[in-house]
Amino acid sequence: MDAFTRAWYALERHYQDTCHILLRDRFAAEPDRFERMHERLDGMLFDYSKNRFGEDTLQLLCRLAETADLEGKMRALRTGAKVNGSEGRAALHTALRLPDGADAVYADGRDVLPEIRRELNRALKFAHSLDDGLYQGITGKRIADFVHIGIGGSDLGPAMCVQALEPFRRQISVHFVSNADPACLDEVLCRLNPETTMFCVASKSFKTPETLLNAEAVKAWYRGAGFSESETAHHFCAVSADTEAAQSFGIAAERVFAMYDWVGGRYSVWSPVGLPVMVAVGGARFRELLAGAHAMDSHFFHTPPRRNIPVLMALIAVWYNNFQHADGQTAVPYSHNLRLLPAWLNQLDMESLGKSRASDGSPAACKTGGIVFGGEGVNCQHAYFQLLHQGTRLIPCDFIVPMTAQGAEDGRSRFTVANAFAQAEALMKGKTLDEARAELADLPEAERERLAPHKEFPGNRPSNSILLDRLTPCNLGMLMAAYEHKTFVQGAIWNVNPFDQWGVEYGKQLAKTIIGELEGGTSVHDASTEGLMAFYRECRLKGGGAA
């Protein structure tokens, strides 16, 4: 039996030996539990004391990480080794946020930092030219709106950042279009003036069908407004790894910005894919975002596992996913401006870790990626928190809470923070049947006994609390990088590749065939798919409006 398997079995035995210990009892027996089980990094505090484990558990989890060669895999990530084995690529998103003066970073034998610096500076300069009015629309009017057309990693990260940093927004309004459903683009275009709008087409391959369909629809919008092809091109820029394809689409080379084969889409907001963030908040704020992410990178690469925030986040996730058989995990930002964070995390975690094959192609040896969902607190308390508190499923929760409001401070911010703290405490402590009876002491005994079971809360429901002193570009960068590295560590322990996404491709492949077949002709599919296609054609014949 190898060392990793022994470490795994030790954790399984440990769970059986300790699963009866309640969190409320741990806190009662360990007055210093919070002091021992929280970490701070600049403006961030990570509290993991409300989890179903003790110091002995953490030691066993760290041993598991050691036997999985986490240290070696982290070194490979940092130094440009081809950690994305199925595609034969490095994953150098951390290089995108290195400060000036950093040591060389190599991919395929060449230092990538000069290229990173060049493209970042080009994108920042272009964003500044829009903001300053130096680059104007073809009719000489200032650009007032910037529309980013992308999907998946080219959309979720930038959209989340722009929303999160709304208080830092400058004068240009930034919009996002991702879905190929015509309503997605139409609801944006109806508010815009073609003379004062810049469109950015973001696609790593410049073959993404949803993105190109929307870009072509924008061209048609300009034609309908009387613009020539060259006049329309003046209102386009692009971000792609295939810069020649972007230029073939009609976008001038000086407005095509490079992204890189060695950065996956869901890790690309730090590259020129972050152009809408640069436009929204300015170059200085974007550099603060990069600096925050780099601060977390430095912490991750140079801090021992027991004090390492992303490593701890990952080990906790592995503990629940593999040894306590949790049914999922939820992330709840108690900040209106962070309301898109759960969608970004959903892609980051589930697209990265939703793998049934190990890195070498063999079947995965354990349960891998979990179901990640979430929503905006306090709203979630009036939705799915009932299941968290009294349901039969184990779903650990991350509470992400800025301490300072970004709006008017009139008591609502304090209310929001108080609710986050209260929910975490309620999940941990629960309410015993006797405590429920005591609350109902004024009722007749029969009524008290009838109601008390419904007011009992099992408790012992785990959570992490991630507190930010303020929601700033720097703190947002730290938060995002922490979750990126958490995802990497989980992949390292489960021995899956978190940087590919072959499962996304198969449906796209079938869709290419079905698109043509929807208009009629020969098709050979299963009976269900044929029936769905027949209903589509029926609706078209009746004038149902499908397109």
Curated annotation (Swiss-Prot):
Isomerase as a keyword?
yes
UniProt enzyme class? isomerase
Cellular component, GO annotation:
cytosol
Which keywords belong to this entry?
Answer: Cytoplasm, Gluconeogenesis, Glycolysis, Isomerase
Which pathway features in its UniProt record?
Carbohydrate biosynthesis; gluconeogenesis; Carbohydrate degradation; glycolysis; D-glyceraldehyde 3-phosphate and glycerone phosphate from D-glucose: step 2/4
Q: Which PROSITE patterns match?
A: P_GLUCOSE_ISOMERASE_1, P_GLUCOSE_ISOMERASE_2, P_GLUCOSE_ISOMERASE_3
> Which residues are the active-site ones?
351, 382, 508
- A Pfam entry, by short name: PGI
- Which cysteines does the record link by disulfide bonds? none
A single Gene Ontology molecular function, please?
monosaccharide binding
What the protein does comes down to:
Catalyzes the reversible isomerization of glucose-6-phosphate to fructose-6-phosphate.
> Which family is this protein grouped under?
Belongs to the GPI family.
Q: Know the name of this protein?
A: Glucose-6-phosphate isomerase 2
**Organism this protein belongs to:** Neisseria gonorrhoeae (strain ATCC 700825 / FA 1090)
